[in-house]
């Protein structure tokens, strides 16, 4: 059974159909966006019909535009004239889903094909604060269709249909070796040093899955190690309009492990950073959202060699920190404890899913709320309207 997403403009004259809303960036190419637009012929009235793909970086709220400030920058715009089709447009073969939709919807349905360029960022949302309203800041993608005499004509929101999509990346099939780090610390009155090693067995880890952090300690000093603290930091670089860098701790835990002087220690610890434990942190980078609550911590940004970082708008990376709390002893005890630590880079992503082709010619259409006539931004929540519509 093929699932199809449908969105209709508020006047009911124009609908857009897409077979999916997540499009995978394979680093060297991005999956094409193929869909169908259904239009009322009386509404078209000899005008042209366009489909537009927009990638935008939003770093402020729409309500601030009234004071003359624009907090949105279009990073990429691609337009296809669907009706009448331009003679110079390349003839792209129809997909199986497009053929089924055209057969189902009739003569007033038209196919379209859009292709993202490879140097665009992935969808990222910055978690809003509790009092924030409107669209969240971040990188978003939108497919829009409208009828007009030409592209310069101003089209109201109620006369166009817009559907938010996501550009995503999956973990590489053949990841590299796991990271490793070491530090050596010498203390006053100790003839031998303290050596800390930390490593992970894998380069890439998956959202929601435990991350194994291996710790090895050679304590040749006369100091006692009281605790091991492991934390995971998310680093968000906003590189488009400024050089802002935000570091937020998404996981932290202290493990009580007493390591005596002149002894060794080795153990593997499991840590799992989750959005559920960080839902109150404003500005935390998340994977782009389609519905309320359907996202997770942002995936690590995978850069192609030679790529211009500025075009990406927002870069997301992670690091694991391992710190030892070393007691210096004496009458002050832990008040004079010293911190010894190392950092490991962490790549956090989703695994590549298996490709399961639809085994049936049936089409299930999931329809989304229309934009309100007042021009207000439409809801991105799906209606519970899954059914074999239009058959």
From Swiss-Prot:
Upper classification of the organism: Eukaryota, Metazoa, Chordata, Craniata, Vertebrata
Matches recorded under PROSITE patterns: ARRESTINS
GO biological process: endocytosis; signal transduction; visual perception
Compartments where found: Photoreceptor inner segment; Cell projection, Cilium, Photoreceptor outer segment
Function: May play a role in an as yet undefined retina-specific signal transduction. Could bind to photoactivated-phosphorylated red/green opsins.
Family stated for the protein in its record: Belongs to the arrestin family.
GO terms for cellular component: photoreceptor inner segment; photoreceptor outer segment; synapse
SUPFAM superfamilies given in the database record: E set domains (SSF81296)
Disulfide-linked positions: none
Entry keyword set: Cell projection, Disulfide bond, Sensory transduction, Vision
Comp. bias (Basic and acidic residues): 369-379
Natural source organism: Sus scrofa
Record GO terms (molecular function): opsin binding; phosphoprotein binding
Subunit structure and binding partners: Homodimer; disulfide-linked in response to retinal illumination. Interacts with CXCR4; the interaction is dependent on the C-terminal phosphorylation of CXCR4 and modulates the calcium ion mobilization activity of CXCR4. Interacts with GPR84.
Signal peptide residues on this chain, from the entry's feature table: none
Stretches for region Disordered: 369-391
Name of the protein in its database record: Arrestin-C
InterPro entries: Arrestin, Arrestin-like_C, Arrestin-like_N, Arrestin_C-like, Arrestin_CS, Arrestin_N, Ig_E-set
């Amino acid at each position: 059974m093929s699932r199809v997403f449908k969105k209709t403009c508020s006047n009911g004259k124009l609908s857009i159909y897409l077979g999916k809303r997540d499009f995978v960036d394979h680093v060297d190419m991005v999956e094409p966006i193929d869909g169908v637009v259904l239009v009322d012929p009386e509404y078209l009235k000899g005008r042209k019909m366009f489909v537009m793909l927009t990638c935008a970086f939003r770093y402020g709220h729409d309500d601030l535009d009234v004071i003359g400030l624009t907090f949105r920058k279009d990073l990429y715009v691609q337009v296809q004239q669907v009706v009448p089709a331009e003679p110079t447009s390349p003839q792209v073969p129809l997909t199986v889903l497009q053929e089924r939709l055209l057969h189902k919807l009739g003569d007033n349905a038209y196919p379209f094909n859009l292709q993202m360029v490879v140097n665009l960022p992935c969808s990222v949302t910055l978690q809003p604060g509790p009092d924030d309203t409107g669209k969240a800041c971040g990188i978003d993608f939108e497919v829009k269709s409208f009828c007009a005499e030409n592209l310069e004509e101003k089209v109201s929101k109620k006369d166009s249909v817009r559907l938010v999509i996501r550009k995503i990346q999956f973990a590489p099939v053949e990841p590299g070796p796991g990271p490793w780090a070491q530090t050596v610390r010498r203390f006053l009155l100790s003839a031998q040093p303290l050596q800390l090693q930390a490593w992970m067995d894998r380069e890439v880890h998956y959202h929601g899955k435990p991350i194994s952090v291996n710790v090895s300690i050679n304590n040749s000093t006369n100091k006692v190690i009281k605790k091991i603290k492991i934390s995971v930091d998310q680093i968000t670089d906003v590189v488009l309009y400024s050089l802002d860098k935000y570091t937020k701790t998404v996981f932290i835990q202290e493990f009580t492990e007493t390591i005596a002087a002149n002894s060794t220690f080795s153990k593997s610890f499991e840590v799992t950073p989750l959005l559920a434990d960080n839902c109150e942190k404003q500005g935390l980078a998340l994977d782009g959202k389609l519905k309320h609550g359907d996202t997770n911590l942002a995936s690590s940004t995978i850069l192609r060699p030679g790529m211009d970082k500025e075009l990406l708008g927002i870069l997301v990376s992670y690091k694991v920190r391992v710190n030892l709390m070393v007691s210096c002893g004496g009458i002050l005890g832990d008040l004079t404890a010293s911190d010894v630590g190392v950092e490991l880079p962490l790549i956090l992503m989703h695994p590549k899913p298996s490709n399961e082709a639809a085994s049936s010619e049936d089409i299930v259409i999931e329809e989304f709320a229309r934009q309100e006539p007042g021009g207000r931004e439409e809801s991105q929540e799906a209606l519970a309207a899954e059914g074999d519509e239009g058959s």
